[in-house]
Amino acid sequence: MKNAFKDALKAGRPQIGLWLGLANSYSAELLAGAGFDWLLIDGEHAPNNVQTVLTQLQAIAPYPSQPVVRPSWNDPVQIKQLLDVGAQTLLIPMVQNADEARNAVAATRYPPAGIRGVGSALARASRWNRIPEYLHLANDAMCVLVQIETREAMSNLASILDVDGIDGVFIGPADLSADMGFAGNPQHPEVQAAIENAIVQIRAAGKAPGILMANEALAKRYLELGALFVAVGVDTTLLARGAEALAARFGVEKKLSGASGVY
């Protein structure tokens, strides 16, 4: 068994990604052909469940883009279900300390290395027990990315990085900026300093730093600092802004207004 995304991170090859929030296999397949290295299927803030994640994994599978799945929480039951339908790389949200990071890793490993329940006869991941030695190969194919997005998590970063089985650490700029008192403004100098310091620290520890940043200049800055998996846009934002721009070119007055948002 292989995990091309995990292999790329280990080799130090920067991976450029796109966030998927439309919760739809048709749009997921459309974007899988766009050329991004990875696509994040979001189960935390988008209206996804195990079934919709499954259909998006199936839609992306024929393409070179690698799927990364974010569950709604660091929940071993939910993680087990996502792994069984074929997710190999998980982005675990709101990890605050080393114990929570260890719990995330344990949820992705079969015993005795972890607590993942054995149900391979029912699992797409094992091709319903058609992959020889799946139970003995699966642990090494798992890629665990933990998300730090508060001052508490930042203060515990060194101990999180010491946890065996953590492949990468993703900085959540929206929640981090809110926790630091700058909600909606991840470009605030204090937030940027925290992000940049974390990227350098993560890379120095031999782990892969990651982030979502739609600001092109900042995304490139993070890559220069050593970030290895950077999502540079969100499908919902691309669709909304693209549709608005097209309407505006034909003189259609925008009916709704609002904040531009973080992404």
Curated annotation (Swiss-Prot):
Keywords: Aromatic hydrocarbons catabolism, Lyase, Metal-binding
Gene Ontology biological-process annotations: 4-hydroxyphenylacetate catabolic process; phenylacetate catabolic process
Residues with site note (Increases basicity of active site His): D84
Catalytic activity field: 4-hydroxy-2-oxoheptanedioate = succinate semialdehyde + pyruvate
Site entry: Transition state stabilizer: R70
GO CC entries: cytoplasm
Chain residues that bind a divalent metal cation: E149, D175
Cofactor binding description: Binds 1 divalent metal cation per subunit.
Pathway stated in the Swiss-Prot or TrEMBL entry: Aromatic compound metabolism; 4-hydroxyphenylacetate degradation; pyruvate and succinate semialdehyde from 4-hydroxyphenylacetate: step 7/7
Class of this enzyme: lyase
Cysteine pairs bridged by disulfides in the record: none
Listed Pfam families: HpcH_HpaI
Gene Ontology terms, MF aspect: 4-hydroxy-2-ketopimelate aldolase activity; aldehyde-lyase activity; metal ion binding
This enzyme's EC code(s): 4.1.2.52
Sequence positions that bind substrate: Q147, A174, D175
UniProt subunit comment: Homohexamer; trimer of dimers.
Task performed by this protein: Catalyzes the reversible retro-aldol cleavage of 4-hydroxy-2-ketoheptane-1,7-dioate (HKHD) to pyruvate and succinic semialdehyde.
Protein name (record): 4-hydroxy-2-oxo-heptane-1,7-dioate aldolase
Organism: Salmonella typhimurium (strain LT2 / SGSC1412 / ATCC 700720)
